[in-house]
């Protein structure tokens, strides 16, 4: 019993000492984490058109003099030539823009071939000059198919991975349907089999995986593609 009383006294004394010492310590400044990288969306205050036509993604070249493949020189020239600037510039926060980078215009089966009948461009020919010889009806059809009338991120409304989600583009009716599906790593495929679409959409290399994601604009959201996609074959150009 005496041992227990002495132990209690010792604990009490130690507590008083610690309390006294603790009172002499200054309060530490509250730690606030400041990330090195900004977590804000850098394009949230500009429209899709303002981004696509900006110097940030135009008039930049590789060492061999070719346009940087991930930029949008041809896309901005195509939008202007087709008279569709308003579709990319009008306030509307409920759209998804599938942005076709320079790579999507160059090569067999890509946009330049689809709208001019040939993938060839002359030496020194600018994107504006190429689009000046395009079939504008075909060009408008391609661009409208790459605007979806729903705001789509990698997981909203693509909530479940491995599930096909069907959306409507600016082309009305069945021919304007487009299908997106994500995997468990948040990679998103467009019109990839077994999407519930005609084989003209899912086969023959006409499906595509999104390259870069989630460009948040004041009038929607954008994702970039390395190749164009389709539902039905685009008409042959009348050149």
Protein language model annotation of sequence segments:
Residues 18-22:
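C-terminal motif of bacterial Sec signal peptides marking the signal peptidase cleavage site
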């Amino acid at each position: 019993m005496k041992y227990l009383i002495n132990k209690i006294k010792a604990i009490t004394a130690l507590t008083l000492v610690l309390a006294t010492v603790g009172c002499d310590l200054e309060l530490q400044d509250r730690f606030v984490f400041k990330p090195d990288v900004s977590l804000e969306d850098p394009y949230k205050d500009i429209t899709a058109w303002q981004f696509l036509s900006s110097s940030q993604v135009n008039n930049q070249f590789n060492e061999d003099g070719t346009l940087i493949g991930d930029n949008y020189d041809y896309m901005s020239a195509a939008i202007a030539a087709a008279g569709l600037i308003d579709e990319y510039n009008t306030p509307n926060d409920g759209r998804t823009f599938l942005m076709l980078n320079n790579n999507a215009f160059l090569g067999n089966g890509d946009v330049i071939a689809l709208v001019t009948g040939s993938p060839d461009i002359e030496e020194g020919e600018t994107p504006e000059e190429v689009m000046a010889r395009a079939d504008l009806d075909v060009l408008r059809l391609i661009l409208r198919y790459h605007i979806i009338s729903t705001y789509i991120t990698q997981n909203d409304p693509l909530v479940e991975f491995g599930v096909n989600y069907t959306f409507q583009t600016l082309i009305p009716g069945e021919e304007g349907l487009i299908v997106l599906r994500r995997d468990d790593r948040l990679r998103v495929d467009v019109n990839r089999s077994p999407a519930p679409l005609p084989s003209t959409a899912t086969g023959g290399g006409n499906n595509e995986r999104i390259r870069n994601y989630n460009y948040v604009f004041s009038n929607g959201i954008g994702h970039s593609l390395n190749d164009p996609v389709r539902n039905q074959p685009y008409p042959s150009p009348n050149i």
